[in-house]
Amino acid sequence: MTVELIDMEVYMVDEDLSIKNAGPCHGHSCGCTIELDVTSPKKIEILVITKISSFHMIYDLSPLRAKLNDDPLDMELIKSLHTSTDLTVYRTSMLHHRNMPEKEYCFTQIYSATLNIDTKSTVSFRSTIHDGFLSTYPTIYINPEEKYYKVQNKGRLRMRVVTPILNSDKLQFMDKGEMYAGVGDDPSIVDSSDSDDYTSSEEDTEEEDTEEEED
């Protein structure tokens, strides 16, 4: 069974925090909005990864668009390769999901950006210019100074926040950071610790399932 999807992952490298599954299954769009709360100058390194499972969908996906406080943000495409993506998060009781495989091989693109901010800022990533998709995308509030985040809006996705970043996802220049304490409406927190073996919530998006993390 081949699953057509476009997926997005966002990695805040120095903060050791990642946002997974910011793209709808069987969709042709992905996106994410991050609200950053700082009170002093802060440099933030971000990686944005897009995954496309079907070759012909490459032509449907627009180049990644990014904005910082409504101003265009330069994104550098640093690598293109083939990887796999976890599909278990998308499984539901619906008939066409029951035989969904656990993984799907994808054409993957890795983008890089550096943010220099000194006050509250909003950064957004989009694979489309159509406003009709905006309600689909999640919004996450992050305070890097207090090591705190809150999922403001999950949109219509099964996104999840993972901190610290999974070992399998870390690139060689990532440094291990401190863990965040997450609160909010079903933040779907995943404490990955030092292992790549973890479980995440597979409940419907309407169902609240808040899990507290321990340092």
From Swiss-Prot:
Ranges where the record places region Disordered: 179-215
Compositional bias (Acidic residues): 193-215
One of the GO BP terms on file: viral process
Disulfide bonds: none
Pfam families the UniProt entry points to: Pox_C7_F8A
Top-rank taxon, per record: Viruses
InterPro entries according to UniProt: Poxvirus_C7/F8A (IPR004967)
Its biological purpose: Plays a role for multiplication of the virus in different cell types.
Family: Belongs to the poxviridae C7 protein family.
Protein name listed in UniProt: Probable host range protein 2-2
